[in-house]
């Protein structure tokens, strides 16, 4: 019996993904100067405000605000007309050192305990060179292409976007065909919806998906809800850990 499996990926400008990247960048900065850093950093974004909170014990001297602004700038939130911009967002720092009680429980000369932070889902497989299941590999590929086209060609695309790819598998658990592709992207106010759909189909989707898995029944759902002008942290709250 065949079945359909769907995976989702979001763009670098999606609110949750912005938060992931800020927390990740802060971790990288801490580890670069102090490999023994202990970092539990959460990020929250809404409207034009970025909040970092958590517990960090490190000898590294990290300017959290500068790190956050660089991440946002590199993503492409630069102009204030989006309602969220790297130079103007309000920044709140609620980071403290790790609790001494937790520190005592995980420190030691020989045996180390572990904190309670973990993230587990999924599996490795041989479906793709990335050793990831095909639906998530293709969904990620679409979002990487979206970022490339947006940054090099513009075309009215904005940073916030999401993709879903549904694959039909045969009874031997092998990918049989692509059942459907959903790609929704934020766009400029002056971009016509049909023009947007043509841009996404020709500039992004067509270059990412294997032709052998496409057929006349494959469904392309591009901005199926219609216009998507208000996006990013103005449209949704973002939080670390929901889109890693």
Question: Language-model segments: which ranges?
Answer:
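N-terminal, positively charged regions that mediate nucleic acid binding
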Residues: 1-40
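Flexible hinge/switch segments at interdomain interfaces of large molecular machines
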Residues: 1-5, 45, 177
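Glycine-rich, mobile lid/loop segments that gate access to catalytic sites or pores
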Residues: 6, 66, 73-234
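Short glycine-centered, acidic/aromatic-flanked micro-motifs in structured strand/loop junctions
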Residues: 12, 54, 185
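Short, charge-patterned binding micro-sites
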Residues: 40-58
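Short glycine/threonine-rich loop-to-helix capping motif typified by GTGT followed
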Residues: 55-62, 226-243
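Active-site-surrounding "flap" and adjacent substrate/cofactor-binding loops of secreted or lumenal enzymes
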Residues: 58-72
């Amino acid at each position: 019996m065949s079945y359909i499996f769907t995976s989702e990926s979001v763009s670098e400008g999606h609110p949750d993904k912005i938060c992931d990247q800020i927390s990740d960048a802060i971790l990288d900065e801490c580890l670069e100067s102090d490999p023994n850093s202990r970092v539990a950093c959460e990020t929250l974004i809404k409207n034009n405000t970025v909040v970092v909170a958590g517990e960090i014990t490190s000898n590294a001297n990290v300017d959290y605000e500068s790190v956050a602004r660089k991440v946002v700038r590199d993503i492409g939130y630069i102009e204030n007309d989006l309602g969220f911009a790297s130079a103007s967002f309000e920044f709140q720092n609620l980071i403290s050192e790790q609790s001494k009680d937790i520190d005592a429980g995980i420190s030691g000369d020989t045996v180390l305990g572990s904190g309670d932070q973990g993230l587990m889902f999924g599996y490795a497989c041989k479906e793709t060179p990335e050793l990831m299941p095909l639906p998530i590999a293709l969904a990620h590929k679409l979002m990487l292409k979206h970022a490339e086209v947006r940054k090099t060609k513009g075309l009215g695309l904005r940073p916030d976007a999401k993709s879903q790819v549904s694959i039909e598998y045969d009874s031997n658990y092998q990918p049989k065909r692509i059942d459907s592709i959903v790609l929704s992207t934020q766009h400029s106010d002056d971009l016509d919806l049909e023009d947007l759909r043509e841009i996404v189909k020709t500039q992004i989707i067509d270059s990412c998906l294997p032709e052998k898995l496409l057929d006349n029944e494959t469904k392309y759902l591009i901005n199926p809800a219609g216009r998507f002008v208000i996006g990013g942290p103005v449209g949704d709250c973002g939080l670390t850990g929901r889109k890693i």
